[in-house]
């Protein structure tokens, strides 16, 4: 990524943040890919641009449900033209918010770590679920299953709703849960009309200077969500998803021990991954 005239204040797994002033920052989505909490050496070309377009689409589509982190400024308002030209498709000007210290995960279907929990205990994050649900089965209602927010490189840990209340307070926990479920329901209903099932997703929220709950970071992208195609969906299976699953599957089969450094990912696996991200963008926004 090119050096910018702005001061970098944070570097995450995928996004970098730059200071504009005390109220705004520039958020830049890179082409970095993380799998199993390790950042891979091989970037996924155009991934940052595709993620930014998908996020921007959802932020606008869901703006009637709650406020979001956009300031209304363009990258050209805050960067020299040469820098803005380079980053215009992968950067956004956002409000500086106070992040809420949990990951807000909503699940509409049974898979992943939720499936493992359910098979062992009949619950997910302490929530009782009906007996007899199968892998990829639709849950009776979407559920809010928060996790703790850990540092880059550490695994986030699933927590109960009671633990969520203890971490952020009862009132805010209820606000976050209700907002996350409302956002998921609206997005899932829309995506279904485009041939995409949103299995689960992770939202990030912050508070603005007035204490207003605000949607931030990225929204309903293949990085923060599991998307399945309606065409290949089948209960009782593990449906293929529109995301980095190709890379994860390849890494699983490579014998890698999931500790840095990660092995070099073959070009054809990277190409298939780019195609999946692009397909998700095309289906959702056309």
From Swiss-Prot:
Pathway membership, UniProt: Purine metabolism; IMP biosynthesis via de novo pathway; 5-amino-1-(5-phospho-D-ribosyl)imidazole-4-carboxamide from 5-amino-1-(5-phospho-D-ribosyl)imidazole-4-carboxylate: step 1/2
GO terms for MF: ATP binding; phosphoribosylaminoimidazolesuccinocarboxamide synthase activity
Catalytic EC class: ligase
Alphabetized UniProt keyword annotations: ATP-binding, Ligase, Nucleotide-binding, Purine biosynthesis
Pfam families: SAICAR_synt
Domain of life according to the entry: Bacteria
Cystine residue pairs: none
Record carries keyword Nucleotide-binding: yes
GO cellular component: cytoplasm
EC number annotated for this UniProt entry: 6.3.2.6
InterPro entries: SAICAR_synt/ADE2_N (IPR028923), SAICAR_synth (IPR001636), SAICAR_synthetase_CS (IPR018236)
Family recorded in the similarity comment: Belongs to the SAICAR synthetase family.
Protein name: Phosphoribosylaminoimidazole-succinocarboxamide synthase
Species name: Actinobacillus succinogenes (strain ATCC 55618 / DSM 22257 / CCUG 43843 / 130Z)
């Amino acid at each position: 990524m090119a050096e910018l005239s702005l001061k970098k204040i944070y570097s995450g797994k995928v996004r970098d943040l730059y200071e504009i002033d005390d109220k705004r920052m520039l958020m830049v989505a890179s082409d970095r890919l993380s799998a199993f909490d390790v950042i891979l050496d091989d970037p996924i070309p155009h991934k940052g641009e595709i993620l930014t377009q998908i996020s921007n689409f959802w932020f606008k589509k869901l703006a009637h449900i709650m406020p979001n982190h956009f300031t209304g400024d363009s990258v050209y308002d805050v960067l020299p033209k040469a820098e803005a030209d380079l980053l215009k498709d992968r950067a956004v000007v956002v409000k500086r918010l106070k992040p809420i210290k949990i990951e807000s995960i909503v699940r509409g279907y049974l898979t992943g770590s939720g499936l493992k929990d359910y098979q062992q205990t009949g619950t997910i994050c302490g929530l009782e679920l009906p007996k007899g649900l199968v892998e990829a089965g639709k849950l009776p209602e979407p559920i809010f299953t928060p996790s703790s927010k850990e540092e880059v490189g550490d695994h986030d840990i699933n927590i109960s709703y009671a633990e969520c209340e203890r971490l952020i307070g009862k009132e805010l926990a209820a606000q976050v849960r209700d907002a996350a479920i409302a956002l998921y329901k609206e997005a899932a209903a829309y995506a279904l009309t485009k041939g995409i099932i949103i299995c689960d997703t992770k939202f990030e929220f912050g508070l603005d200077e007035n204490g207003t709950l605000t949607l931030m970071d990225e929204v309903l992208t293949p990085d923060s969500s599991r998307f399945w195609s309606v065409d290949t969906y089948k209960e009782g299976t593990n449906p293929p998803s529109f995301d980095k699953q190709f890379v994860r599957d390849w890494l699983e089969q490579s014998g890698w021990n999931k500790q840095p450094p990660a092995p070099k990912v073959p070009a054809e696996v990277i190409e298939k991954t780019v195609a999946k991200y692009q397909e998700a963008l095309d289906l959702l926004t056309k």
